[in-house]
A protein has these predicted regions:
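Bacterial extracytoplasmic/cell-wall-associated proteins, especially those involved in peptidoglycan
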Residues: 2-136
Length: 136
């Protein structure tokens, strides 16, 4: 018997799911504050650059977890029933409905504290939340 693949035609739900998976993979569901901070950064990037959320959700230059060689890449396939994934999903929904306060003061870039990308070498971060540094 062939598996049945159900196509979700509701693009908003698809984008919500993709963003939730990215937020989960980047934060590993560590805390609500971390999920809110990353969602705030995504919203800021969308609003300040007019980039579409589906494009942001798949941008490997923003999210290290999207790279196949990333240690966090496997987390993109987390079980949707996990409580920490569900927290990320709810946070993304709040962001997409405009119900999330900007906890990163307008930041549009981030990296995790254990990494230092070249673009951040001479930049000053404006917020540190959940092991992530946020920049304008």
């Amino acid at each position: 018997m062939q598996p049945l693949y159900i196509k979700n035609d509701d693009e908003r739900k698809v984008v919500t799911e993709k963003l939730a998976r990215v937020v989960y993979a980047e934060t590993l569901g560590s805390s609500l504050l971390a999920a809110e901070a990353l969602c705030s950064m995504i919203a800021n990037l969308h609003l300040k650059t007019a980039r579409l959320l589906p494009d942001i959700a798949t941008d490997k230059s923003i999210f290290e977890s999207l790279a196949e060689d990333s240690a966090r890449h496997a987390s993109l396939d987390a079980d949707a029933g996990r409580r920490d994934f569900q927290m990320c999903l709810r946070t993304v929904r709040r962001m997409m409905n405009g119900l999330l306060n900007d906890s990163v003061m307008g930041a549009t870039k981030f990296h995790r504290a254990e990494n230092l990308p070249q673009w951040a070498v001479n930049a000053g971060y404006i917020a540190e939340i959940g092991g992530m540094l946020f920049y304008l």
